Amino acid sequence: MAAIRPAGKPEGTWALPKGLIGPGERAELTALREVKEETGVEATPVEKLGDVRYVYTWAGERVFKVVSFFLFRYRAGRLGDIPAEHAHEVAETRWLPLEEAPGLLAYKGEREMAAKALERLSR
């Protein structure tokens, strides 16, 4: 599973690529774009895994966020070949063994999505 250590996060903080939906863009296309921008890898969609909903505070305001996660299959590219205009977003990239990913990802919702991916691929 392609994972990133977001810029500014401590060593060992592994996360899944994600980002904001662009104007007129569907969630699946956003996910494909973000994977390419943050990892350098091109992917082919397999299926939607689910949504993670959470609330956080930004500049004193509560923000409700929904992040959609998709299962993709590797298509092309080299992990870490991040386009220069996005290199500031990512400190490090790594392939996580799928069986270990639920225990290595830093965020609960992402660990749950990794477990769903593992379950889906084990069928």
Task: Spell out what each predicted region is.
Residues 21-112:
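Unchanged
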Residues 116-123:
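C-terminal alpha-helix
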